Amino acid sequence: MEDDVLFRELFSKIEELPVIDCHEHILGPKREVTRREPIASLIQGYVQSDLLSAGITQKELDILNNNEIETEEKWELFEKFWKKIEFTAYARVTRLIMKDIYGEEEISLQSILRVRDKIILPTEENYNSLFEKAHIEVI
């Protein structure tokens, strides 16, 4: 019981610590795409390695990355591979983005469609607010 209390207390303090991130893949507002289809947005970064490991072909991955293809058209393909990777460390980042930034507890077609209208536009203010929320100091 005491260990539980100590853990929660320590964890809450650790969450408040600022982070210095010297290895980032965020492009910044001047280089980011302004219109982003939600599946294409959510699979950016290392999660694509998991998709490839799960057997997605490059052609299928190109479909998921295509901003011009509507979410509903690519959902079946995404869902097929998401089920294979959803518990990997990289997919955890995707789940955290959905939960912490967009308020969605699950990844489903309905939740992704709701996110479509909430995709954060790449402005300086939006980028800075994400860093503040994560306690990452931008220098």
Predicted regions and their residues:
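Metal-cofactor-binding active-site regions of metalloenzymes
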Residues: 2-139
